[in-house]
Design a protein with these regions (language model features):
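Short, conserved turn/kink motifs that form compact alpha/beta structural patches or helix kinks used as
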Residues: 1-154, 158-161
């Protein structure tokens, strides 16, 4: 059961805010209406935690040769950040054939802030409790207004083979 949050217009809750209620994180992924007759907005539960890392190339010496024992490694950008996850695969159907759902593409919604601003295409995304890795293929930063700096960062990532 979703908790009911009672707020006023003075609380300054915006799209992209994270709320922590009764042991669970919620992301305000919809626009919050500021008119007195339009108080309702939806808080989506963050059921997953994500980690985002970036591949760092090996170090080289002044001649351009790789220094020993500094192979390619992952540099963590975000660790255990609450997120909303959906699978955004495609349906493939034709006459007399069953549709196939390809679940190798995920869509992750995160709070837009100075940590998530660092995410780029090609970064590696992992889900807590899931051994697979996903590569960020696109991202969209939306819902910025004149009153706020946050917003929602929507990432599409493809499962790595």
């Amino acid at each position: 059961m979703k908790p009911v949050l009672r707020t006023s217009l003075k609380d300054e809750i915006f799209r992209g805010n994270l709320l922590y209620v009764e042991g669970r994180f919620y992301l305000i992924a919809d626009d919050v209406q500021e008119a007195p007759n339009c108080f309702m907005t939806h808080a989506t539960p963050c059921l997953h935690f994500v980690k985002v890392s970036r591949k760092v190339n090996p170090q080289t010496d002044k001649f351009g040769f790789a220094v020993e024992d500094t192979g390619e490694r992952l540099h963590p950008l975000i660790d255990n950040f609450p997120a909303v996850l959906t699978f955004s695969g495609t349906m493939a159907d034709a006459k007399n054939q069953a549709g196939a759902y390809f679940a190798d593409v995920i869509e992750v919604k995160l709070q837009g802030n100075h940590w998530t601003d660092e995410i780029k295409t090609g970064d590696i995304l992992t889900l807590e409790g899931n051994p697979g890795e996903y590569e960020v293929v696109s991202w969209i930063r939306d819902s910025l207004t004149a009153k706020q700096k946050g917003g929602v960062l929507t990432i599409q990532a493809r499962r790595k083979p």
